Amino acid sequence: MTVLWTDEVTVTHKEHVMAMLAMAFPIPAGKTDQWKKFMSELAGARKAEFAASRRSLGVRERTFLQHTPQGDLVLVTLEGDHPETAFAEFSKRTDPFTVWFKQQVSEIHGMDLIAPPPGPMPQQLIVSHS
């Protein structure tokens, strides 16, 4: 798995302090339409399964598409009490939805979500508070 950037920060949401894990994943050339179809399924036919999956992991996921001159990126944030633990727990799951999700990620990004990301998570360097 190629992780271009990750960060863990603390954010306040409804006066509850939560951790946030942010990750960026490149979309290989020619795969953006397939990725958009995957996102449409998560927002449509598989919305309930997706919500239940993230709820059972104790996280809220937000996913963004970023177009750059170098290619498209997926930006993913996980918010919760322990998003890094949720990411590790997700990699171990074998229920039908999770297997399908991992297969989609593998086909689009060429990443194996069963294996942990290479290397340690980076250190947070700067946090801006209002």
Predicted segments with their positions:
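N-terminal ordered "arm"
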Residues: 37-47
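A short catalytic or substrate-binding loop motif that flags glycine-/basic-rich loops and adjacent residues
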Residues: 17, 55-57, 68-69
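Short, well-ordered beta-strand segments in beta-rich or mixed alpha/beta enzyme
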Residues: 21-26, 61-92
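Intrinsically disordered, low-complexity regulatory regions enriched in serine/threonine/proline
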Residues: 117-130
